[in-house]
Amino acid sequence: MGYPGQRPVIPPQSHRDDRETLVSEHKHKGKTCRQSAAVFNVVNSIIGSGIIGLPYSMKQAGFPLGILLLFWVSYVTDFSLILLIKGAALSGTDTYQSLVNRTFGFPGYLLLSVLQFLYPFIAMISYNIITGDTLSKVFQRIPGVDPENLLIGRHLIIVLSTVVFTLPLSLYRDIAKLGKISLISTVLTTLILGIVVARGVSLGPHIPKTEDAWIFAKPNAVQAVGVMSFAFICHHNCFLVYGSLEEPTVAKWSHIIHVSTLISVFISILFATCGYLTFTGYTQGDLFENYCRNDDLVTFGRFCYGVTVILTYPIECFVTREVIANVFFGGNLSSVCHIIVTVVIITVATLVSLLIDCLGIVLELNGVLCAAPLIFIIPSACYLKLSEEPRTHSDKIMSCVMLPIGAVVMAVGFVMAVTSPQDCSHGQEMFYCSPDNFSLTNISISHFQLTTQLSILNVSIFQ
């Protein structure tokens, strides 16, 4: 793992333009990764558990407004990720925490440390929830397996996946080693996207649309921004990825972020659109909860997504561990402490995830309480205080816009999430999966076969 001593120190830029190249003052002792690996790490961090809730955010905001908000959140994410590195250049720091400490002192440092720990920690909890929900349904489709068997229950699956997969992967000390794993995760996400699109075409026409399906805007738009922020945020680990680059520069980082954001927004828009258009007002926080259990194609998608979040989990654990290392151990962990801290973090996250089974509220609260300040407020505040650019500079204007919007999203979103919680139908089959609904009883068959059967049924009725 790239702890502060293993990353390049970003030199102060007080006498240089903040767009200039950042050059390391000493040889980078940690392992480095190529730009392509960095892109996959960033995309994998963005396209984590949050993407599964994007169709749900369309339901909350209203589909037309939801699409516009998703583009806006992606632009703000791109801008603020680059802004953070510019702020680091101005302050001569090499971590998010040291940047805020240099800018706002110890109180700011503590606040950021709490947020930077809570966001990935809650993300780890959501990953466990998704793993338990998705893989339990996968195992239920195995011939001869009793769906009520405790050995395929979500709780045991969460524990086993943690012990066998996520814990060993999280024990790595160097994030660059996860580049190939992130590539695998990105490929699996593409397969999942294809399945959601295919089911949008074959399944969507047979599910009744809700009355408010096409309303432009809905009252829960602020909560929707929270879910989108949860999906797009990767600010908590951007310094880890930046520090793993060979000869990191602002220009190189900007290119990586632009490419990563474009890939992520394309996948996100397509996923959100197809998912929402299929189920409209019935869309759940976990999109896979909407599909019928006897759909074998979606079962394969559940398996792919379960693997994806398992592979994404270690990146979030890296960040939580680094926060603890910086706050309590001066930025360096011995081998023994490294193992102990990792095991404690993962154990607590696992225990919490065993007690919670509704993903929607987790995405909302993490989005408005942690993601919003990390994306909108803190990068803008740091840059505004550090930069000596004129007030009319584009970066300063955008920062002035982002800061108050982030505060509104954080405050209003939290109040609405607590006072107006959304329904959660966890573990229940949706009404359209009933055997009485002929068009969906054999969902795993092709769209052509489904259409043919419906036509035959209509003919027999008229006869």
Swiss-Prot record:
Residue positions with a glycan: 437, 442, 458
Pfam families registered for this protein in UniProt: Aa_trans
Spans traversing the lipid bilayer: 38-58, 65-85, 105-125, 150-170, 178-198, 225-245, 256-276, 298-320, 336-356, 358-378, 397-417
Membrane topology, as annotated: Multi-pass membrane protein
GO cellular component: membrane
GO molecular function, one term: L-amino acid transmembrane transporter activity
Entry's Gene Ontology BP terms: amino acid transmembrane transport; sodium ion transport
InterPro entries: AA_transpt_TM (IPR013057)
Localization of this protein: Membrane
Basic and acidic residues composition bias: residue spans: 14-25
Main localization category: membrane
Keywords: Amino-acid transport, Glycoprotein, Ion transport, Membrane, Sodium, Sodium transport, Transmembrane, Transmembrane helix, Transport
Location of region: Disordered: 1-27
Family of the protein in this entry: Belongs to the amino acid/polyamine transporter 2 family.
Family annotation (PANTHER family): AMINO ACID TRANSPORTER, SODIUM-COUPLED NEUTRAL AMINO ACID TRANSPORTER 11-RELATED
Function in brief: Putative sodium-dependent amino acid/proton antiporter.
Name of the protein in its database record: Putative sodium-coupled neutral amino acid transporter 11
Originating organism: Bos taurus
Lineage, broadest ranks: Eukaryota, Metazoa, Chordata, Craniata, Vertebrata
